[in-house]
Amino acid sequence: MAVTRQRVEIPELAHRHVDHQKILSQRSLKSTSPDGMRGLEWFYLVKGASSTPPEEVFMDDTSKCPFSGGKRVPANRDWWPTQLSIEMLHKNSGLSDPMGEEFDYAKEFKTLDLNAVIKDLTALMTDSQEWWPADFGHYGGLMIRMAWHSAGTYRITDGRGGAGAGQQRFAPLNSWPDNANLDKARRLLWPIKQKYGRKISWADLMVLAGNVALESMGFKTFGFAGGRADVWEPEELYWGPEGTWLGDERYSGERQLAEPLGAVQMGLIYVNPEGPNGKPDPIAAAKDIRETFFRMAMNDEETVALIAGGHTFGKTHGAGDPSLVGPEPEAGALEDQGLGWKSKHASGLAGDSITSGLEVTWTTTPTKWSNNFFENLFKYEWELTKSPGGANQWTAKGAEAIIPDAFDKSKKHRPTMLTTDLSLRLDPAYEKISRRFLENPDQFADAFARAWFKLTHRDMGPIQRYLGPLVPKETLIWQDPIPAVNHELVSDQDIAALKTKILASGLSVPELVSTAWASASTFRGSDKRGGANGARIRLSPQKDWEVNQPAQLSKVLGKLEAIQKEFNASAGAKKVSLADLIVLGGTAAVEKAAKDAGVDVKVAFTPGRMDASQEQTDAASFAPLEPRADGFRNYVGKRQQFLQQEEALVDRAQLLKLTGPELTVLVGGLRVLGANANGSKHGVLTAKVGALSNDFFVNLLDMSTQWAPAADGTYEARDRKTNAVKWTGTRADLIFGAHSQLRAYAEVYATSDSKEQFVKDFAKAWTKVMNLDRFDLAA
């Protein structure tokens, strides 16, 4: 039988040459990318793919593979682009970390002479290099932009992005159009990184460089915390559905930005500085600004302060035709050594440099802190003009040439602004804040200092992770504060007695397990938020989340609070927090369930959690942590879903820092323990609910049953002989039989000799989730 083969093209963003002239034109055009793309599939954008294998996949000659005659060998995802990927669960493992298992970054950072680093960074700011000369003789503006763009990828929806891991070093971020020429900033920092080595990470150094840049230009920052450990490979992260730089297929309806995205176009940090899709409309741009900054956890005042504060320094670069700019770092030649955007416009350096295509300097003192941004913004009327590179920008009408040139002291320029700068004057809410900052420079300075600190530290998690002598003493609400332990902790004997009381309280195994899981599984390894510490499950908004079963939750918490009150009243200096009791209840239930399945296991428990108050909890800030879907509890909420159930399950597992085997064993265990949300029976493939058996895997892989779709989108397992319905399940259940790798894990736990291993592996993974936010244990 002849097989018809189809030639396909598989463009990869990491190897794509950037046409800067096209980028400028695409600011006002929509890009084209394949249909049907799903959230976790953005790395492989297949055009013209069919069910038949691709005949050829072409690569640039510079990347020839000796084993394939110069052609790239297709990966599984090229053949089956809709296949669920679980690669994200195994990213940045010890196998890719050159520092070794014993390396403790926090310990190394504590030995760092931070003042010496700051001194070296301060000297760097004015040490202009011929290979990349400093604007106005000062690298401050460049370093601020580098730090801002390192942190600015953060998004509240899933907590991903941000400065916390030094991801700007890797593709795709190192080659985003919005990060053009930040490769130069990192190269300027290399001698300092080389000098201090493992004592300071790239992630910390990039943020610190931004802080020192501000301080060196006369601005008083709010503080700095170290503690961002580097990773060694890029995240597999969904940045958008587009297949071209600056594409904007992420909108629907009346410009509704798709979640979880935080930027308006592929390859931008926030918004298009020329306005939406390059249209120079400051009012429309204000809408984009408000939405994107909100998605990075910033309110209107913080937004105005950040834009104006950042644009008090430095300049943009658009000296000439963007088509003369060469490829980004990931598309460069070997001899370029990771430096990109080499320009053929005149010298390509200094006054001839091209980055964004815009040519704007905002203030008369671009290397000194001032209120001149607001002074110029309100002093002049503005007319639309073009940069030398053809980009839309604004020039002050009838103004004198008062703005210094970055490299020629004999030259002056008229004041210029970006479309997005004018939004701060023309949007009514932004205008009110901007005018207040104009009239009250001290308020502006304080707001910018706080907003900058928040921008660069938002993804670091609780203050226990902050390191160094410059950590501010003030506790901020967005840090999700939890009281320090102020009492003697319970002993092993107390723990055993409390377990007995909990199990005798009338609460069932499913109730205790589901409550503990609901409390702990809010944790996000991305921005280190959530988790069981603080017992915020008893507070708004978590107590009212549908997935947490408010009625059952209230019952469980009521009984646990009674046990807590009784113990604390009679134990002298010892106290137990509700946060600890919630976890201990789940731990006791797991041990009982294992025993009921014929396996004795001791589940590790470490006290020391504390209870946060409602006043210490910003309800609006916690709202994004509410799951749209939670495959561990077989829950799909009413809000719009942007992932399939199995994709959402893997996504949540990655946020919980789980591996593929841990994901598998936890789902199988939680199903038989009856931890599904709202009493759902889907995936509860056992007749012994509450016993920690391997029944889920045994019955899922049982060939005497046949699965088929049901009318409501779930699935039914029917007996092959009688056609009777034996079980029901969801996509989050069936994926463990359908996905070859997950099935391989499931088979391990379905064997007749795996019962003890299953229980022990479940207990270990359970403890891991319960302790994800226990940063105090590693201190």
From Swiss-Prot:
The active site is at H149 (proton acceptor). The record marks R145 as: Transition state stabilizer. The keyword Heme applies. Keywords: Heme, Hydrogen peroxide, Iron, Metal-binding, Oxidoreductase, Peroxidase. This is Catalase-peroxidase. Binds 1 heme b (iron(II)-protoporphyrin IX) group per dimer. CDD domains: catalase_peroxidase_1, catalase_peroxidase_2. InterPro entries: Catalase_peroxidase (IPR000763), Haem_peroxidase (IPR002016), Haem_peroxidase_sf (IPR010255), Peroxidases_AS (IPR019794), Peroxidases_heam-ligand_BS (IPR019793). There is a cross-link at W148-Y270 (Tryptophyl-tyrosyl-methioninium (Trp-Tyr) (with M-296)). GO terms for biological process: cellular response to hydrogen peroxide; hydrogen peroxide catabolic process. There is a cross-link at Y270-M296 (Tryptophyl-tyrosyl-methioninium (Tyr-Met) (with W-148)). Pfam families: peroxidase. It catalyses: H2O2 + AH2 = A + 2 H2O; 2 H2O2 = O2 + 2 H2O. It comes from Bradyrhizobium diazoefficiens (strain JCM 10833 / BCRC 13528 / IAM 13628 / NBRC 14792 / USDA 110). Its cofactor is heme b. Formation of the three residue Trp-Tyr-Met cross-link is important for the catalase, but not the peroxidase activity of the enzyme. Belongs to the peroxidase family. Peroxidase/catalase subfamily. GO terms for molecular function: catalase activity; heme binding; metal ion binding. Its EC number is 1.11.1.21. Homodimer or homotetramer. Heme b binds at H311. GO terms for cellular component: cytosol. Bifunctional enzyme with both catalase and broad-spectrum peroxidase activity. It is an enzyme of class 1 (oxidoreductase).
